[in-house]
Amino acid sequence: MYRDLTMKEISEQQIGQTLQVAGWVENIRDHGGVSFIDLRDMYGVLQVVIRKPELLKGITKEMCLSITGLMEHRDEETYNPKIPSGTIELEAHKIDVLGRVYKQLPFEIQTSKEIREDVRLKYRYLDLRNAKVKDNIVFRSKVISYLRQKMTDMGFLEIQTPILCASSPEGARDYIVPSRKFKGKFYALPQAPQQYKQLLMASGFDKYFQIAPCFRDEDARADRSPGEFYQLDFEMSFVTQEDVFKVGEEVLHDTFVKFAPEGSRITETPFPIISYKQAMLEFGCDKPDLRNPLRIMDVTEFFQRCTFKPFIGRTVRAIKVHAEMSKGFHEKLLSFATSLGMGGLGYLEVAEDMSYKGPIDKFIPEEMKGELAEMAGLSAGDTIFFIADKEDKANYYAGHIRTELGEKLDLIEKDAYRFCYVNDFPMFELDPETKQIGFTHYPFSMPQGGLEALNTMDPLEILAYQYDIVCNGVELSSGAVRNHDIEIMKKAFAIAGYDEETLKTKFGALYQAFQFGAPPHAGMAPGVDRMIMLLRNEDNIREVIAFPMNGNAQDLMCGAPGEVTEQQLREVHIKVRD
């Protein structure tokens, strides 16, 4: 036996008792004649007092110990209110070394978050001893447990889908696994359980979910872990888009209410719904951060009637701000704009008499100035910024200027989680290089208008039943009403340049299953890692994953990816080329 109680179970009730505790040496303090050890386990820290110097012989920080001693009250002047056991201490009578430290520690455990990430990841098992780092993983476990119970309570059945599956074109690069038995054949790790969950609906299951591992060979971002991530994947039969919305917003709202920091404000249900077109206009992106009160306006038509040549023939966006701005602020904002690739950033300041001051004032006819004020809702003290370019670039630039203004002027709502749905995404898009029409997102989404729309409309005008959930500018989930009709599916793929044979080859299981009476179905998949990153207010998603890869998709701790033996390569019929 190594311990009687954990640190969280110890209290003043044990005073006068002989106890055995176990943990790691967090700190050693020598006060001349008496020494102290801060002993840490997963649950907390306990002060151990050493009055026999021989007990400390050979003891160093981060050794794993079992200590037997008498529980005592601390002297009142030495109380530590920062820890639950701050009024008690253990007087050591016996110390057993359970795990020695043979090498110099690469960093101080308590300050591990302050060192270089590559060192932290190489010694992640030490980094995780830091209570602040460990707390994220404990928190993650609690959130996942809650999500699992919530879905079960809502009538969903948890079903595991295969990890080794067939490769299919789903947007990102696959991780492929060679077959030993079938020369030249490969499995793929699933980018998502997409086809399997749809096959479950075709199998007659009504509501499915799982905490699903997903694997994508793509580059890292602050909110995207390379290699592997987890999502709360769910699918439902006999439902509309609105039915899925109700489930998604209930799960996310209730999860954030339970786990968000105390005092946080969370969007009430139903979440606002913003079309893709509206999002691109008002926010400059399809991931709107609703904590930022600034909105983007379209003033294209107005400026076609003015004489400012750089705006004529271009899409013109405007952002109105009511805030004090110095000349230096304008210069910094212009510098930011040029760093994005913009040629400049026009603006007007509104004076008390509602006259304008700014470089483009003289290009607006006098009789039109009141029209601009009414259109943009201008008042004295406002500044309005203008962005002009091709439509896609104007949206992109305006979105970044909006974000920069919100951050630099401290306009972003604090302690808030602001959710929305973004829907009505385009079904198809034009590849700017090949000029070929392809799917915008998931190829098996149901087009709005069904087969008639595919037969009669310009493909680039067709919308899909696709939707995202966005929170604070972070895409938390994507989903769609699925295309379960073979005829609609064949036509949609034909528009995107795929013949029926390709459909059968690449998505054979779905193609075959949908020949036998597939039900209407829809679903979504909120990202677990991103959810926890937001709830913990972490800037990097790797902080909420126990053993994350680095930004280059390397496991610095275990050395993956690594080399394998020639024998292993031969067994799977692979030869590595230089």
Please tell me what each predicted stretch does.
Residues 1-578:
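Class II aminoacyl-tRNA synthetase catalytic cores and aaRS-like
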